[in-house]
């Protein structure tokens, strides 16, 4: 049995020479697996429909050896399993950004980061928690004052002031600010999106500068990104926080590790369904 995941763009035909007849890589993979003796079913799935607080559409392919069975019912079984699975965890199918990270505000207080010299990490908030936050926290806060990898980036005064203006006056949330608007608002980077707390997050990427926190003038922490990806707080993330230049080819920093991952909350549901398919 095979479970294969990739970005939605994997299903598009890209041809550097712009010739007719370009074939999506997804088709090549499917054809190759069939030649190897697999029954194959592919689909594009939005993980936000499965309790993950993030709009993340991914190409999912399931392959089962022909002598064992067919993966045809994978998506149907996934949907049938979803509601009872989420109910058991106290969750609904659509979790908003606010419901996922409202307890990780910088205003809760901060202490020196234990794994990042010269930086500060945020303390846990003690406000009423959502069911999603309770699930992600587990018992971790009983033995830890701060969440793992919840270290705040250092930002210039100019950038902080720019972020404050955006939070106060920019009319749209959840839409990327680039082009003329970027220059008009004094944004130095290539673009940024102000997150909307009342809906699911856009797709988490490996770039920390893509998103502005919904109510604080700062970018997201690794832990906040991990929460949105449904990694529980006990899951420790290692290595550097960021990297750059030529080292991008050699290192996989924390933001990238999280941005490239399959959300565990979806992976668990997929695993349950795959197990049922093998046993049937």
What are these language model-derived features?
Residues 1-182:
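Class I S-adenosyl-L-methionine
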Residues 122-280:
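C-terminal target-recognition/interaction regions appended to catalytic cores
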